[in-house]
């Protein structure tokens, strides 16, 4: 594993699943990690994990992580999440755009409001994250 000592990573969608594992992997390689997602508390037992449980687990294993509240539907939240990461760690070198939403069912049965939600979380949010992160990534 290549060393990421001195690097800072922001992982969106890091409260569970692939994002959680990416955050933990990057931390194990030495990166400081901003664990970003909107999940601050478990509201559905089928979806365990929060930004706090993931960042706590990283810190308990000797890594460096902070929880960052970031709602991919909210442009201000995305900008604030990038700013908080840079303020806390001093730089931003890596972005993992992992946040996504899945609405089960066929295209024929999906509601229009769910299409809007998918658009906001799966396309618009990641583009906004890259827009706000790009100036910091270019400095890295």
Language-model segments: what does each one mean?
Residues 3-36:
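Canonical Rossmann dinucleotide-binding motif of NAD(H)/NADP(H)-dependent dehydrogenases/reductases
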Residues 7, 63-64, 91-92, 137-140:
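Active-site loop of short-chain dehydrogenase/reductase
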Residues 29-52:
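Conserved glycine-rich Rossmann-like NAD(P)H-binding loop of the short-chain dehydrogenase/reductase
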